[in-house]
């Protein structure tokens, strides 16, 4: 009989205990008072009410007040908020949306926030009011331990509708020491992605502008726009306002960056940058607009906004499909360099190009067609023969066909042909004339890859030979886009090594290379490449530093070595016949335990014909070391062997971070001009949950030891 009575109680509980959404109560023992309608549950007690789950050892349901009374420890899990509430006493409504909790603690698992309070009052789905509350995003392992920082408040009100938390009579404590009091402060809830408010402050000191304190204010303008304002004044009396506006549009987005300053001499200085992307245009085209303007040449570098010394204003439109690319650009350059003139450099450029790939049905292979036009305009109108006022309009076409096939013994044969055609109109330059030219190319290539695989390792050796023939076209055209030819493994088998259209590589030549690669289980990989160019005659198109001058080029070498994920080495060099180094570039990445490094070394021989009057010998080193789980030290060093000078280009950065706090102290040495350097010290401090998501901004979740 008792068994059937228990079944009846369990069946009737949802009918007269909890109103609203369906409720499920389970317990080891359940006692129902037929006179009062009260229910007492004990043992492992669980109530599930929609997204809320309550667990305790004992509770009483009061039928007259339609409430739940819990006299012992219990917890409530909210699956929507991903939040757990612990308390030692509670009086809750039957739907658990309203009530009073004593000695309570709330843990937001996703945002890692913890709030403890002497008393918590729940007022429906919207408000949760906490008296004598302590809040922190730091993980607290023991009840007696103190977090790195905390906020103690007389009252905390969590508004779940407006997604904000209000602190009344709040004291901010750092390592247990009170450092700040405010009678009222409202901050967004940690799950808010965007909200108006102050961002973390940054303190910067440099030997030119003194102490600067940055306190950005972020202002949302609806769901699709925002503004960030950063006013600051330094110890030298310079007043500055920085502003950034971002706007998402139906057809793209726009970003405006602006800063204006009044220096100690009452001089007004400013810069304005605009970047707009247009993603929805007719016929699937996209576009980009960039505008840059400054009040004077040194404002941005002196105030730490950047060292850009050429301003590029442009409008571009483009479309890319599987076998087609179309692009058109209007570009205007403004130089800030004292060694250049906006009148004599090509300040305005218009270019357009169409690239199309075709697959010929009868002959096979691939056919790439490129049509482009370009116009350069200079402001000068002196009509001199030195090209300082020269304006050029060019139209050109390029057709390239190539096909590969495998012949006997695994030899891969390839054939390619190319036709280039250009027409030039030259203005305001008596030394150059309008002209047209057509240049045909032909190439035959043979390569023989041989692979040997054995016991988890493989060897690949591949000799390559390519014969290229072309005419020697002596038409002289102004060279505007091919001033810096390069010779490396990426263009060894190209028809030419000039980057543009205005110059092309002449004559017959033989390109040779030998590739070797060793791979063992992907954990150890080594390889090298040797290459050389042999010509029938020296056409005197290249300077000595390119490695391409003479009938026989210098030796092109490229090597790489990878050991697991911790060591990587790449080296590229041009060697003369006597093995002296003409150019060398080495990249080395290495990591071991807590240490990681990335370095690059560059050596270029001087070449006055290319405007390089001194040899370049520079070492770049980036290194970082994790002392433990909380501290990291990183540095970036650039050493110029030619000038015998060391600079800290990115400086020295010491960072402390844990589950709730991140702080950075950095030293930077910047080059703001060819003769002046700026030393800068910066400090900023960030607390998890204030203006950012704690789980994304900070480093890790601390695990308590048992």
PLM features: what roles do these ranges have?
Residues 5-15:
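Bacterial N-terminal signal peptides
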Residues 10-12, 55, 178, 211:
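Generic detection of intrinsically disordered/low-complexity segments and helix-coil linkers/edges
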Residues 83, 89-102, 106-137, 144-151, ...:
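Outer-membrane beta-barrel proteins and related beta-barrel translocases across Gram-negative bacteria
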């Amino acid at each position: 009989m008792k068994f059937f009575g228990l079944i009846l109680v369990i069946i009737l509980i949802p009918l007269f205990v909890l109103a609203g959404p369906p409720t499920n109560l389970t317990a080891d023992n359940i006692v129902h008072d037929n006179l009062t309608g009260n229910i007492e549950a004990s043992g492992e007690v669980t109530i599930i009410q929609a997204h809320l789950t309550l667990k305790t050892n004992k509770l009483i349901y009061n039928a007259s007040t339609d409430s739940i009374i819990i006299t012992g420890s219990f917890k409530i899990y909210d699956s929507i908020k991903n939040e757990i509430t612990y308390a030692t006493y509670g009086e809750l409504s039957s739907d658990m949306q309203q009530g009073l909790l004593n000695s309570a603690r709330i843990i937001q698992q996703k945002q890692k926030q913890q709030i403890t309070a002497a008393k918590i009052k729940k007022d429906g789905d919207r408000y949760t009011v906490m008296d004598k509350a302590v809040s922190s995003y730091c993980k607290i392992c023991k009840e007696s331990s103190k977090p790195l920082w905390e906020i103690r408040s007389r009252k905390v009100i969590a508004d779940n509708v407006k997604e904000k938390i209000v602190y009344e009579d709040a004291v901010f404590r750092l390592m247990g020491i009170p450092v700040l009091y405010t009678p009222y402060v409202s901050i967004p809830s940690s799950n808010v992605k965007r909200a108006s408010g102050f961002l973390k402050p940054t303190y910067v000191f440099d030997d030119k502008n003194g102490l600067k304190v940055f306190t950005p204010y972020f202002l949302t303008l609806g769901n699709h726009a925002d503004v960030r304002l950063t006013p600051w004044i330094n110890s030298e009396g310079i007043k500055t306002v920085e502003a950034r506006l971002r706007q998402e549009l139906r057809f793209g987005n726009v970003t405006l960056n602006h800063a204006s300053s009044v220096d100690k001499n009452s001089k007004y200085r400013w810069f304005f940058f605009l970047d707009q992307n247009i993603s929805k245009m007719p016929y699937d085209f996209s576009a980009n607009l960039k505008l840059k303007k400054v009040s004077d040449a040194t404002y941005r570098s002196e105030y730490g906004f950047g060292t850009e010394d050429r301003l590029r204003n442009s409008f571009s439109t483009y479309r890319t499909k599987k076998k087609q690319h179309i692009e058109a650009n209007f570009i205007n350059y403004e130089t800030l360099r004292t060694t250049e003139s906006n009148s004599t450099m090509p300040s305005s450029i218009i270019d357009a190009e169409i690239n199309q790939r075709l697959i010929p049905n009868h002959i096979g292979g691939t056919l790439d067609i490129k049509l482009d036009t370009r116009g350069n305009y200079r402001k000068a109108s002196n009509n001199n023969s030195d090209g300082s006022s020269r304006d050029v309009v060019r139209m050109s076409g390029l057709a390239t066909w190539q096909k590969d096939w495998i012949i006997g013994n695994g030899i891969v044969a390839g054939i390619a042909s190319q036709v280039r055609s250009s027409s030039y109109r030259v203005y305001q330059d008596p030394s150059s004339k309008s002209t047209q030219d057509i240049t045909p190319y032909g190439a035959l290539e043979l390569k023989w890859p041989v692979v040997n695989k054995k016991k988890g390792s493989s060897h690949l050796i591949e000799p390559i030979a390519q014969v290229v023939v072309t005419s020697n076209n002596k038409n002289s055209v102004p060279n505007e886009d091919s001033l810096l030819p390069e010779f490396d493994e990426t263009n060894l088998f190209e028809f030419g090594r000039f980057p543009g259209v205005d110059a092309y590589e002449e004559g017959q030549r033989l390109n040779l290379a030998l590739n070797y690669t060793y791979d063992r289980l992907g954990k150890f990989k080594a390889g090298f490449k040797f290459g050389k160019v042999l010509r029938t005659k020296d056409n005197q198109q290249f300077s000595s530093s390119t490695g391409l001058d003479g009938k026989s080029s210098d030796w092109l070498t490229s090597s790489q070595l990878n050991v697991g994920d911790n060591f990587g080495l790449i080296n590229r060099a041009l060697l003369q016949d006597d093995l002296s180094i003409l150019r060398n570039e080495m990249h080395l990445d290495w990591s071991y335990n807590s240490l990681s490094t990335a370095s690059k070394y560059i050596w270029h021989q001087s070449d006055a014909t290319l405007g390089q009057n001194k040899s370049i010998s520079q070492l770049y080193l980036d290194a970082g070391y994790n002392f433990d789980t909380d501290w990291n030290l990183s540095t970036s060093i650039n050493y110029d062997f030619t000038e015998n000078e060391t600079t800290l280009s990115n400086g020295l950065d010491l960072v402390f971070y844990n589950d709730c706090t991140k702080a950075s102290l950095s030293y930077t040495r910047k080059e703001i001009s060819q003769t002046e350097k700026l030393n800068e010290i910066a400090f900023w401090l960030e607390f998890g949950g204030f203006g950012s998501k704690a789980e994304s901004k900070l480093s890790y979740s601390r695990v308590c030891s048992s």
